Every structure is written in structure tokens, then in C-alpha cells.
């Protein structure tokens, strides 16, 4: 009998407390970058019933109305009714932002490679904003080269938000979570969806029967391809029986607490660093995007069925301390050749990544919900497949 395995990933909606915090942090980052593309930003947010605290470090020439950015972001998410216990116009906003530490700025603004040298490469100027390790991943399970469980989980909560905002399901409120369990065959190919869990906040008048029917027909069956659903697929819709109190009224939220949702749903490794609220000199963010860019182009080039790229940095140093490519035995060429090609084609110094992916632009608020990678609904530079031919040529050399 062939062995089959299950793998589960989850996602959360834009109205989830942690995602509210992520979106506020990235909205502040974008507002700063509009005026000052060279700003250094590390904006953290905490949300809870009736309050938002924004804190962290910013070095910039820009002036941003933090209060307005916070309220506009909350309103766009959909918290516009005081009945939700958290509303854009009535929430208390408490900013506490200070200038970046000069000790950190010293290493970021002048990397180890150029200190004391008169001749220098401009891309050596920026040192990594911290030490750390970052991962990027791609697999040929979906057209966007993402693991199927996280891809479906994101699409489910995105569909819920779409139906809520359009008014098609008027009783929906902003907070929601999804979880998808996919069955894989002995060749590691997804064959069916075993279980779908959706918990969605709702008005008190909505009945469980109505929610169950609408979610299955208008969300699950509209999102998950029919070939993955069968008579044995299990649907768990609001399994607690009631989800009226939600958002920051139900749970506090913090920036950076949904790092697995933000990436590959647990299918690939994670270096531990969060993304939102950080400018691109923070390699937690920019190098993770670069690693995804590399992995996606490797798989798209047909050089491997799956690829995981690890990058690692030392604070104040421009060049990565290590580059690793792992293809889990699926590569058509030696992994050492892939690593050599990666170093040859991709400039992995922080300034090189920023230039390669054009990361000084205000593009981050849109990434703060429904995943930073594998997006098909928005245009992100690290999802481009413009290095495929170069990689093919490099490994043949």
C-alpha cells in the first residue's frame, strides 16, 4: 500500500490582531519612504481593545502624521464600527518613536568592507543592519511555485475579505483564520484536500447554519479546485460555535507574530526574523525576499523541483557570510554548481539586493496581509522570473 502524508498550513485575514499590527507598521514605513527613500525604519505596533501603540526607531528627514496613518489603515481593513470594540475613529493612538542607535547606524551606513579604504564600490557602502539567517523557498506544486497548503489558506481568507467588503456576505466581520490540510502521495505530490478549517468573525444575528452554508459554497468551493475536494474532505467552520467578539477586542496583536503565515506555512525553514515595519537595510526582510527570488528562478528554470536558499549575514558587513542551496535531491545539476551560479548572478550585499529588487519604494503595506511571497494578486519584484535564462547558462558553463 502506498504511503500518503498530510501537511497543514494556516493563514489569517487582514483583520486578525497581529495582521492589523503588521499593516500599521508597514503603512508607516511606506509613508516615510514616500518622502525619504533612504530612511531607516523599525516600526513596531501593539493593538488591543481601544488602543494602538506604535514604537521603535526611525532615522529620517520625513514628517509623517502617525495618528492619521494608523486610523486610515484600520479603516481600510474594515474596523469602522464601534460595535466591533475597535474602531478607526475612536481608537487611542500612542506613538513612541526614537532615532536609530548611532552604534547600529555606524555599521549600516559604512560597511566593514569600506572602512579605512579610499577606493570603494558603492554597493559595499551599506552593511547588514543585523546578523542573522534568512530562507527563501520555491516548489513546483502551484503556478506561483508555492506549497499548496499555504497557497490555499491565503486564498480562503482573502476571499472572505472580498465577500465582506463587497457586501455579498454582509454579516462578516474583519477577523478570520483558515487552515488547510493537504494529502500528499508517495512522490510528494499533492493529491487532495483532507481538511479545511475556517473561523470567521460575524454579526451576532448570523446563524451557524447560514455561516456554514455560505463559507462552503461561496468561499471554499469558489477557491479550492474541485479536483482536490471529495466526499471525505472534512469542513470545520467556526468550530467553537460562535465568533462575535474578535479582532483586538478578543486578542491583543503585535507586529511580527505571524512569520510562518507570512512565508511558506511551515513547509520550509524560517530564520526567525519578522518583516513588517523594517526598511530594506534590515536583511531580515530584504535578504528573505532575495532568497525567495533566487529559489523561484531556480525552480522556474527547471533546475530543481524544489529549492530552499539560505543566506546569512554579520551586522555591519556587506557580503553574506554564507550562501546555501538545498534542493532535497530534486536538482538536475550539483548543488555546488547552483550555489556558484547564485553568487555569480545575484548581488547579495544589502545595497545590491536593494538595487536589484528596487526596494526603496513604498510597496510594503500590500505585503502585510496574505503573504509576502507567492502573491498572484499584486506585482512584487522578488516574484519576477527574469533570471531563468542566466541560471540555465551559468550551470552549463
From Swiss-Prot:
CDD domains assigned to the protein according to its UniProt record, in alphabetical order: S-AdoMet_synt (cd18079)
The keyword Magnesium is assigned to this record: yes
GO molecular function, one term: ATP binding
GO CC, any one term: cytoplasm
The entry's keywords: ATP-binding, Cytoplasm, Magnesium, Metal-binding, Nucleotide-binding, One-carbon metabolism, Potassium, Transferase
Cofactor stoichiometry and binding remark: Binds 2 divalent ions per subunit. Binds 1 potassium ion per subunit.
Residues at which L-methionine binds: 57, 100, 251, 282
Pfam families registered for this protein in UniProt: S-AdoMet_synt_C, S-AdoMet_synt_M, S-AdoMet_synt_N
Pathway: Amino-acid biosynthesis; S-adenosyl-L-methionine biosynthesis; S-adenosyl-L-methionine from L-methionine: step 1/1
Chain residue ranges for the region called Flexible loop: 100-110
EC number, UniProt record: 2.5.1.6
InterPro entries: ADOMET_SYNTHASE_CS, S-AdoMet_synt_C, S-AdoMet_synt_central, S-AdoMet_synt_N, S-AdoMet_synthetase, S-AdoMet_synthetase_sfam
Subcellular location: Cytoplasm
Cofactor(s) this protein cannot do without: Mg(2+); K(+)
GO biological process: one-carbon metabolic process; S-adenosylmethionine biosynthetic process
Residues binding K(+): 44
Positions that bind Mg(2+): 18
Main location: cytoplasm
Binding site for ATP: 16, 175-177, 242-243, 251, 257-258, 274, 278
Xref: PANTHER family: S-ADENOSYLMETHIONINE SYNTHETASE
Protein function: Catalyzes the formation of S-adenosylmethionine (AdoMet) from methionine and ATP. The overall synthetic reaction is composed of two sequential steps, AdoMet formation and the subsequent tripolyphosphate hydrolysis which occurs prior to release of AdoMet from the enzyme.
Family assignment from sequence similarity: Belongs to the AdoMet synthase family.
NCBIfam families: metK
Subunit: Homotetramer; dimer of dimers.
Listed name of the protein: S-adenosylmethionine synthase
Taxonomic classification: Bacteria, Bacillati, Bacillota, Bacilli, Lactobacillales
